[in-house]
Regions:
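Bacterial N-terminal signal peptides
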Residues: 7-15
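Positively charged n-region of N-terminal signal peptides that target proteins for export
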Residues: 1-5
């Protein structure tokens, strides 16, 4: 039976019974794309502010297509009570729609909020270039812009273009310069361990061509950037949209979109302060290794590592969570999980990629990109695309607060 989509704007609170569990999960539809509307929403980004507020962002695609094809704005909503209710929709930044202009559109946002202050950083694509087009080159690059807040997202700076600050990091690479890139949308990683500058270190994972993913990092909350592993490092050659996460010992994991699952790689520091270190070899995670399988799709997802308690013996552990559409195709977004070993140093790429637990199914309909963060109450804030419409160009942007007990079939909290 097909689910009929009701073309009204729904801002209220709903309850959903999980497909895998009888527990009730709170659900908010933050942005809705009516099927009759020609202006779609897409692309989730979320951050938890230092003061406890939660900011959710999304593309509002007036051009009807991806960033690079015309005018795209970024809209937002804020929760000031931990996700229980949400304020009105607002425009964070508006594209001019002027063809060829650097401010033609703004989209594919990635965001981080500093854990020690009210500082917030949003990175996004700007302009009217298409990432994969042959005409998008080092001389005509996919451009990168930032917005900054110093007061937990209440007010924002003027946008600033930082394209050259990123691209020049790779101009002297033995592999040649980066022709086109963008920061993987959703959540920028802030280290829980490394602070050698004004702020805890942040990492942004790049989708880049040629030669796949790169990772950049900053010790001054995005004022200056460095290439993790140096300009020649290729964490995931030919990788697609990526995310970063940090192991409890400070090593960095990149998780990259792949057909049928994910690609993982781990960065081993030799000197955390200077950033020196080396990437390993890529490991695939999919059905073959009992990994994070996604049937008949490749899609942006989120990797998150959180502290937890194993309910069987009350032992404190760390869990890795990875979201993907379970499929077939872009449908049935879910969350895989696995307990990390107590000896974190023993984690290898092969062991991390394999043997994940049966996933929790978040959505029971068409669904795609997702991101998540750990709330102060220990639950998971999950923000994702659902009810895909307009031939895949639009969706509803849905927020759910999900307890770890629900995700892990009552094994952890």
């Amino acid at each position: 039976m097909r689910f009929l989509k009701i073309c009204v704007v729904i801002w209220g609170l709903f309850s959903l019974i999980s497909c895998n569990d009888a527990a009730v999960v709170n659900k908010h539809v933050l942005f809705q794309t009516p099927v009759s509307d020609t202006i779609p929403y897409r692309i989730p980004a979320i951050a938890g502010m230092h003061n406890g507020d939660i900011l959710a962002l999304t593309d509002y695609r007036l051009c009807g297509n991806d960033i690079g094809y015309g005018r795209v704005d970024i809209h937002g909503r804020v929760s000031r009570n931990g996700g229980k209710s949400w304020g009105e929709e607002f425009v964070l930044i508006k594209g001019s729609g002027v063809s060829g202009a650097t401010d033609c559109g703004f989209g594919d946002a990635a965001m981080v909020a500093d854990r020690e202050s009210g500082d917030v950083l949003v990175m996004m694509v700007c302009g009217e270039t298409v990432y994969w087009h042959e005409t998008t080159t080092r001389q005509n690059p996919n451009r990168i812009a930032v917005l900054r807040s110093r007061d937990n997202g209440k007010t924002w700076s003027q946008w600033e273009e930082i394209t050259e600050s990123v691209y020049t990091l790779f101009d002297d690479s033995v592999h040649g310069c980066v022709q086109s890139c963008f920061v993987g949308s959703g959540k920028i990683l802030q280290s829980r361990k490394i602070k050698v500058g004004s702020h805890y270190r942040i990492y942004a994972a790049l989708c880049a061509r040629p030669n796949g993913n790169r990772v950049i990092y900053s010790d001054d909350f995005g004022q200056t950037w460095h290439a993790l592993g140096g300009p020649d490092a290729l964490p995931v050659p030919n990788g697609d949209e990526p995310k970063c996460e940090e192991l409890p010992d400070g090593r960095v994991i990149i998780s990259s979109r792949a057909w049928g699952g994910r690609y993982f790689n781990i960065y081993e520091y030799t000197d955390m302060a200077s950033g020196a270190g080396v990437w390993g070899e890529v490991a695939g995670s999919g059905k073959r290794v009992n990994g994070c399988a996604s049937l008949e799709n490749a899609c942006n997802g989120e990797l998150l590592i959180v502290p937890a308690v194993r309910k069987e013996d009350r032992k404190k552990v760390h869990l890795a969570l990875q979201s993907v559409p379970l499929g077939p195709q872009r449908a049935n977004v879910g969350i895989y999980y696995k307990e990390l070993p107590e000896d974190v140093a023993s984690i290898t790429l092969e062991s991390f990629a394999a043997d994940w637990e049966k996933p929790y199914q978040v959505s029971d309909t068409t669904s795609a990109y997702s991101t998540m963060l750990l709330l102060k109450n220990g639950n998971i804030a999950f923000y994702y695309e659902e009810s895909i419409c307009l031939d895949g160009w639009g969706s509803d942007m849905v927020y759910k607060e999900i307890p770890l007990e629900v995700i892990t079939a009552d094994q952890y909290q």
